[in-house]
UniProtKB/Swiss-Prot annotation:
Keywords: ATP-binding, Cell membrane, Endosome, Immunity, Innate immunity, Kinase, Membrane, Nucleotide-binding, Phosphoprotein, Plant defense, Serine/threonine-protein kinase, Stress response, Transferase. The lineage of its organism: Eukaryota, Viridiplantae, Streptophyta, Embryophyta, Tracheophyta. The MEKK1, MKK1/MKK2 and MPK4 function in a signaling pathway that modulates the expression of genes responding to biotic and abiotic stresses and also plays an important role in pathogen defense by negatively regulating innate immunity. Involved in the innate immune MAP kinase signaling cascade (MEKK1, MKK4/MKK5 and MPK3/MPK6) downstream of bacterial flagellin receptor FLS2. May be involved in the cold and salinity stress-mediated MAP kinase signaling cascade (MEKK1, MKK1/MKK2 and MPK4/MPK6). Activates by phosphorylation the downstream MKK2, MKK4 and MKK5 in a calcium-dependent manner. Belongs to the protein kinase superfamily. STE Ser/Thr protein kinase family. MAP kinase kinase kinase subfamily. It comes from the Eukaryota. It catalyses: L-seryl-[protein] + ATP = O-phospho-L-seryl-[protein] + ADP + H(+); L-threonyl-[protein] + ATP = O-phospho-L-threonyl-[protein] + ADP + H(+). ATP binds at residues 339-347, 361. Signal peptide: none annotated. Residues 1-20, 228-247, 256-287 are annotated as: Disordered. Induction: By touch, cold and salinity stress. This is Mitogen-activated protein kinase kinase kinase 1. Interacts with MKK1, MMK2 and MPK4. May form a ternary complex composed of MEKK1 and MKK1/MKK2 and MPK4. Interacts with RACK1A, RACK1B and RACK1C. Binds to CRLK1. Its EC number is 2.7.11.25.
Amino acid sequence: MDRILARMKKSTGRRGGDKNITPVRRLERRDAARNINYDAASCSSSSAEDLSVSTSSLMTRSLEFPEPTSFRIGGGVGEMDRIYRSLGVSGPDDLAISFDAWEACKKRSSSDVVNRFKSFDLDKVRDQDLSEEGPSGVVVGSDSMNHKVQGQDLSEAGPSGGIVTELSEIGNLITPVDRLVADGVVENRRVMERTPTIVKSKGYLVPNNVVAVGVGVGGGIKGLRPPVLKPPPAMKRPPIDHRGSSWDFLTHFAPSETVKRPSSSSSSSEDGCDEEEGKEEEAEAEEMGARFIQLGDTADETCSFTTNEGDSSSTVSNTSPIYPDGGAIITSWQKGQLLGRGSFGSVYEGISGDGDFFAVKEVSLLDQGSQAQECIQQLEGEIKLLSQLQHQNIVRYRGTAKDGSNLYIFLELVTQGSLLKLYQRYQLRDSVVSLYTRQILDGLKYLHDKGFIHRDIKCANILVDANGAVKLADFGLAKVSKFNDIKSCKGTPFWMAPEVINRKDSDGYGSPADIWSLGCTVLEMCTGQIPYSDLEPVQALFRIGRGTLPEVPDTLSLDARLFILKCLKVNPEERPTAAELLNHPFVRRPLPSVGSGGSGSASPLLRR
């Protein structure tokens, strides 16, 4: 305890003693040693020398670094000046060349190779007598243009029995002279001035500034070598053998057979030829049924071919057209305005060299990817089918032509467009719908009798001419029906028949599917809107698959309603054929008489 108290006293004493400690004495100028002999000038000079030495050493060290080979421009002041100084120029003007120097450089670079050979008149050399031939088979001749080149006197002895070429000057020409020494020693002399010669060896005829010596020349290159290489042969495109190639199909769309022109024989012989060709076409149509394969979905989804809409007019020559009987020959034509878009591409108006108007379906086959093969097959089927159809209610096919990557299909021009555009402009009354329906039935009957199914009957695919004639168009999905075995789901959903949607539950579908689509088309013309218009396409598919009929308004006439409901039978076996529907009262009614021009009665086509 005593020890602890003693330590506490000592620590307290230390703390108190710290306050009495005197601070360290500060150094002041008066305490510095006085140097009376101090010279400020000498001190400043010595310090300047030391500074210069240190600066020079730093500069010497900085020069030891390698010069920069790349520069980074950060936008600072003076960066470009440092780059110019490192390049040894004062500014950007030193990097430029004059216009005259540039033009001279271009002329020199383009004429170095070409003009060198133009200076030699090869045609004249062929007509001249060439000099004698040495043992190596090399023939040396002089050129008509003698450009003298400085040389040197070369004299050396060749082996025994050799032939040496000696150049002798006659006027302005230098001609080779072969001289054989009597004792077998060959002497080779060359004058100081020589001219370029034409050397012909192994099929080459090239200019050469070197005199060819047969044998016995010591040193250098032995024999003759032309100064330029023989150009390679022209490259040829490899033949297209791949069966899946788009170009292979494209080249076969417009066959190169002899163009069929109208014969000058009598009308009776023409009728006989037409009958024979018609029988051949029917036989080909039957054979096509076994070769057709299922095609892709609708054109809007799978076959949206591209086109150049900006090109309003262009002239295209028809390279290899094919023509049906009675069609005019189209040798040259011009593409006009865009009329619309079909299953495979854009449709334009065209005019031939004879002033005949027609429709041109332009198909591009380049950027289709995986869908190209399917669309090409679909297009090939349409062309083959159209070439066999000859009916007043079906669009007439007039031939094909190709131009680069595009295929052009020439069709009959129907001026008023589709029924879709027509009922959007006018209100179609029952009398007009009845007239149009009868013509549609005539075309369908012709197709079904031929064994074809259209598979896409709707107002957008039915065209109207100025005289009121209705024509079926867009046969991109049409198929040959054989034993009711069409099992693919094609067409637009709103016009599809139930058996087309429920193809798994049936063996396929045939011509009754077109009758269902016809009923939907008549309903569309009467109401001015598509069937199932209040549903989405997927919802419409489910409704149709379950057998739900589209709504038929009570405002329609009784004959029109009965005709539509007769077509829209869920069971395809209960639907009438096209021939039976032609006897229906709706299509057999007479047209009401339109009032005379003075009565002022409205046209039945005019929308009120």
